[in-house]
Curated annotation (Swiss-Prot):
A motif ('HIGH' region) lies at residues 50-60. Monomer. The keyword 4Fe-4S does not apply. A motif ('KMSKS' region) lies at residues 604-608. It comes from Natronomonas pharaonis (strain ATCC 35678 / DSM 2160 / CIP 103997 / JCM 8858 / NBRC 14720 / NCIMB 2260 / Gabara) (Halobacterium pharaonis). Its cofactor is Zn(2+). Keywords: Aminoacyl-tRNA synthetase, ATP-binding, Cytoplasm, Ligase, Metal-binding, Nucleotide-binding, Protein biosynthesis, Zinc. This is Isoleucine--tRNA ligase.
Length: 1061
């Protein structure tokens, strides 16, 4: 890029981004930046892989933008950052999309289509979606190693999962067995508890009577799942609860019901009984061992009747609500299963993986379980066993991918027994540092403590096959199985000839591979891994381990990972679980956990609600850099982000302000052939304001670095934007612009150039991780061939201690506050800043404020356009102020009686120069001609300024520091300069109309309707000529003419460029 080249008048994000994309391609900016840091200290970042099941949404965009910003920051800090992007390409997220595309309803459709065909479709879909996602990420300005992403479908990555699983097996942490799991009947596979999504639904709510076998009466249970009653195996009670036998009138007689004492009224109410009598009372422990009849024995002949079944047992999950007795079906419920295992009970589950009753369900065989609810309730009612039938609205689990209601059932699954290493998991968790830390110490710790064994098997097709081979007559003992850890081992063991370098490890390949050992043939188990196991090995899978040992030894574990807070139950957990099971260590050292991207109203973005904002829409409206700035101003530590179009527009406005600051000095620097390399800042003729802005830059740099290191890039960005907008644009540029307008090159002008150039270059470096496009364009324009090929190769700035001056910064804070108060006073007096004022009086409340004003009178004089700055020392009153008093008649009346009105009038009539009541008393006595005695309670004082003076208080950081008085009285000299400056502003605007170069000279013709105003303007003809580059004032017959209303006077101005004569 050419140094100080002409730039667009306005910041145009689209144009900037298009140019920068082209430039990056032209100079291989990413590749050169990576190469530039190749010898730096290694920083191992691991990208949490998004599913390749659709385009990027705002949450993905926030996540990827955060990652990109932190990668860029660490590169600028000198690190050699590993930035390999990852993609999760297996599992139900892909399968359900492909099923939808193919019009499939269930697994039977897949089987008819052909397993291999379906796997091929899944692979094509995943690759196709990857391309779209990758283009989305590139459009956000994200720099990662797009040419070499890790894909969970690649053989070397799948091998990493096999290897990790085999290591867990080596530690005796792998077992196969029955568990109660969440099953999606449509997908016909187990899903993890943390994958279950809850919706509010209406379900049956029934109270059922179980007939006692050895005594009169019924146990009463309550359930919302009538379809589990066929599998009822025992009833659970709280052994410490009191249970009552109540006798109720059924209309045809009486019957005895056994319910928990706290639940009697509820049961009686639901049963519609008019009255009841307590006929017995028992502790829960007394009920243990009671036997009962299965309520659906006739309908389900194979219902549990085995040893120990249909008895009452104590359990710790029983609560004192509904009936106080719990229907327990170990073939379904998780706690039921666990208690059943403790009791040594067999498992009865007459339901298939598709949620359809099997033959063992008797009359209900062939029905989908939820569809059978009505028939089961009808049968119970017909037998007189349905005490109450109603509905309940509650949260019920659904499949995370297809939204089908789940069913709880017991199946054979493969597990990594993380419960055996809970202490190790918790210890490894402590080795990682989290931002925010409380997420680790609360939410994550609780999840680990409560997590069951990890069900790693899925009964699906598109996933990493579980690398276990078993014999046909396998007993279920894992020691009798063969676990394969690598492709090399697979090639060595299988009966078929395969190339370990090229073999595809997917199901359609490995299912055909057999292993023969000691005369026994082994075949692979049919399941694939839980997709969370795929991504759980990312920390070594992205390094190509176990194939690539060098990188693993050098880099592992990860220095940093970052994802949203839902990953405490997802990727954060699965990585810790697999890292601990396989290697005994946490696979990451630092975790940054951000929130979710929500709609403007705080609700989740949803197609059904219609409140989704696509990232491309945001880019189209405002540009990638403003979108990134908005996303990066959000707290990344656990808080959810509410999308806001207004805030995104504000960020575009911030960048436009920066653009204007950047654009302002370029023509002057070009005109003067300014060479920043020839001016050393520490030797330049710096003025106070230069020293101040350099000190502010150093302070902001230090504060930003501290925020970045604490993973609060949002706070760092707040500091930077405030510096750009408030310090540089609204203060520094306003002060130094006249130095840059000077006709001759001076030491002062060069110092201003050098200062602003340095500030802008350093600012682009600080901005680069946030807004890489506009930072690139500004940096290139300011540095040309003298800088790096890209700003992203530059070092992150260090605070320059040479220029740190906290006192000066505080001084200018006070000066800026005085200036703001002075501007407010001008507005009250309706006096524009272009018009000078005779004086500004600053009454400081404290010595520090007074010192700052005194030290910087010249700066204040310039900023306030005042001929003189007067300072009133703290503790003193400005002598030109006077005070009037207002009487309080509620106090005067009782004191002065009939004279109160006369006293009040006298108080209101006088003015004093002191707010002491004694001074007022003396003035009133003079007014009345007699002595009186006043007290503080009788009056309140008002401050009166001299005519033409307005006063406004000034504050710093919310603290009152004094009052600024602006004397706006007009003199002929002030009017003359004021009108002249009004003319200058209009002529400058007309120069812009003609798009004149700053050095172009013009001729000017002024026709002023008011003769007095014309005379006043003539007095400052030289000032006007200097400011607008007027070669002469003359009568012009042609040129650019406009009529202006200036302070109610018509002024016709004509200008004509000298070069066009």
């Amino acid at each position: 890029m050419s140094r100080f080249a002409e730039v667009d008048d306005q910041y145009d994000p689209d144009a900037v981004e298009d140019r920068v994309f082209d430039y990056w391609d032209e100079v291989d900016a990413y590749e050169r930046t990576v190469e530039h840091r190749a010898d730096g200290e290694d920083f191992f970042f691991v990208d949490g892989p998004p599913y390749t099941s659709g385009s990027a949404h705002m949450g993905t965009t926030w996540n990827k933008t955060l990652k990109d910003a932190y990668i860029r920051y660490h590169r600028m800090r000198g690190y050699n950052v590993t930035d390999r992007p990852g993609y999760d390409m297996h599992g139900l997220p892909i399968e359900t999309k492909v099923e939808e595309r193919l019009g499939f309803d269930n697994k039977k459709d897949i089987e008819e289509f052909g397993e291999q065909n379906f796997i091929d479709e899944c692979k094509s879909f995943a690759e196709e979606q990857l391309e779209g996602l990758q283009e989305d990420f590139k459009s956000f300005g994200v720099w990662m190693d797009w040419d070499d992403p890790y894909k969970t479908v690649d053989p070397e990555y799948m091998e990493a999962a096999w290897w990790g699983f085999s290591k867990a097996h080596d530690r005796d942490l792998v077992e196969q067995g029955q568990r109660s799991i969440s099953q999606c009947p449509r997908c016909e596979t187990a899903i993890a508890n943390n994958e279950v999504e809850y919706d509010h639904v209406e379900d049956p709510s029934i109270y059922v009577k179980f007939p006692l076998a050895e005594r009169e009466g019924h146990l009463v249970i309550w359930t919302t799942t009538p379809w589990t009653v066929p599998a009822n195996t025992f009833v659970a009670v709280d052994e410490e609860m009191t249970y009552q036998a109540i006798e109720v009138d059924t209309g045809d007689g009486t019957e005895t019901l056994y319910v928990g004492e706290p639940c009697v009224e509820d049961v009686v109410d639901h049963g519609g009984y008019e009255d009841y009598e307590v006929v017995g009372e028992h502790e829960g422990s007394d009920l243990v061992g009671w036997r009962y009849e299965h309520p659906l024995r006739e309908e389900v002949p194979e219902a549990p009747a085995f040893e120990g079944a249909l008895e009452v047992y104590g359990a710790d999950y029983v609560e004192a609500d509904r009936t106080g007795l719990v229907h327990s079906a170990p073939g379904h419920g998780e706690v039921d299963f666990e208690r059943g295992q403790e009791l040594g009970l067999s498992v009865f589950c007459p339901v298939g993986p598709d949620g359809v009753y099997e033959d063992a369900a008797g009359d209900y065989a062939g029905q989908f379980v939820k569809d059978a609810d009505a028939a089961i309730m009808d049968d119970l009612e017909a037998k007189g066993l349905l005490l109450s039938r109603g509905t309940v609205n509650h949260d019920y689990g659904h499949c995370w991918r297809c939204d089908t209601p789940i069913i709880q059932m017991v199946t054979d699954q493969w597990f990594i027994t993380v419960t055996d290493i809970k202490d190790e998991l918790l210890a490894n968790m402590e080795e990682s540092e989290w931002f925010p830390q409380e997420a680790r110490d609360n939410r994550f710790r609780s999840f680990i403590e409560e997590s069951p064994d990890w069900n790693v098997s899925r009964q699906r097709y598109w996933g990493i096959p579980i690398p276990i081979w078993t014999p046909d007559d396998w007993s279920g003992d894992v020691e009798e199985a063969i676990v394969v850890s690598t492709r090399e081992e697979l090639a060595e063991r299988v009966d078929q000839d395969i190339d370990p370098e090229s073999v595809d490890l997917h199901k359609d390949t490995v299912d055909d591979l057999t292993i023969t050992a000691d005369g026994t043939t082994y075949t692979r188990v049919p399941d694939v891994f839980d997709v969370w196991l795929d991504s759980s090995v990312a920390s070594w899978g992205t390094l190509g381990y176990p194939g690539n040992e060098d990188d693993f030894e050098e880099l592992w574990p990860a220095d940093l990972i970052m994802e949203a807070h839902d990953q405490t139950r997802g990727w954060f957990w699965s990585q810790l679980g697999m890292g601990s099971a396989a290697l005994g260590e946490a696979p990451y050292e630092t975790v940054l956990m951000h929130g979710w991207a929500l709609a403007e109203d705080g609700r989740k973005m949803s197609k059904s609600i219609g409140n989704i904002v696509a990232p491309q829409e945001a880019i189209d409206r405002h540009g990638a850099d403003p979108m990134r700035l908005f996303l990066l101003t959000q707290n990344p530590q656990g808080d959810d982000m509410r999308f806001s179009w207004d805030e995104m527009e504000n960020r575009q406005r911030d960048l436009n302000i920066l653009w204007n600051v950047f654009r302002f000095p370029l023509p002057y620097m070009r005109l003067d052939d300014f060479d920043p390399d020839a001016v050393a800042l520490d030797e330049a003729a710096l003025e106070t304001v230069d020293e101040w802005v350099l000190s502010r830059l150093s302070t902001v740099t230090a504060e930003m670095t501290d925020h970045w290191e604490n993973f609060r890039q949002d706070k760092a960005l707040d500091e930077l934007l405030a510096f750009i907008v408030e310090d540089v644009s609204r203060f520094y540029i306003q002060v130094v612009r006249e130095r840059m307008w000077e006709e001759e090159t001076s030491e002062s002008k060069l110092a201003a150039y050098a200062t602003l150039h340095h500030v802008l270059v350093e600012t682009t470096k600080l901005l680069a991780p946030y807004a890489p496009f506009v930072a690139e364009e500004i940096y290139g324009t300011l540095t040309g061939d003298g800088g790096h090929e890209t700003v992203h190769m530059a070092d992150w700035p260090d605070p320059d201690e040479r220029f740190r001056d906290p006192q000066l910064e505080t001084d200018v804070d006070i000066v800026a506050a005085v200036e703001e108060a002075g501007s407010n006073a001008r507005q009250q007096a309706e006096r524009k800043l272009r018009w000078p004022v005779t004086r500004v009086v600053v009454a400081a409340d404290d010595d520090r404020a007074a010192e700052a004003v005194d030290r910087h009178r010249d700066l204040l004089r310039d900023r306030l356009n005042a001929r003189e700055i007067e300072l009133v020392e703290p503790g003193s009153d400005w002598e030109e102020l006077s005070y009037t008093a207002r009487a309080d008649m509620s106090v005067l009346g009782p004191t002065f009686g009939d004279e109160a009105g006369e006293v009040m009038n006298a108080i209101n009539a006088v003015s004093v120069t002191d707010t002491a009541v004694e001074a007022l008393e003396a003035a009133v006595e003079t007014e009345l001609g007699r002595d009186i005695e006043l007290t503080d309670e009788m009056v309140s004082f008002n401050t009166e300024t001299p005519e033409g003076v307005e006063g406004t208080a000034f504050t710093v950081d919310g603290d009152d520091r004094g009052v600024v008085y602006v004397d706006t009285a007009l003199t002929e000299d002030i009017e003359s300069e004021g009108y002249a400056r009004e003319v200058i502003r209009r002529v400058q605007e007309m120069r812009k109309d003609l798009d004149l170069d700053i050095e172009a000279e013009i001729r000017v013709d002024l026709d002023i309707a008011d003769e007095r105003v014309a005379t006043l303007v003539d007095e400052h003809e030289g000032l006007i000529a200097d400011e607008v580059r007027a070669a002469e004032f003359a009568d012009l017959n042609a040129g650019h003419e406009r009529v202006w209303d200036v302070e109610s006077t018509d002024i016709t101005i004509t200008i004509d460029p000298v070069s066009e004569r």
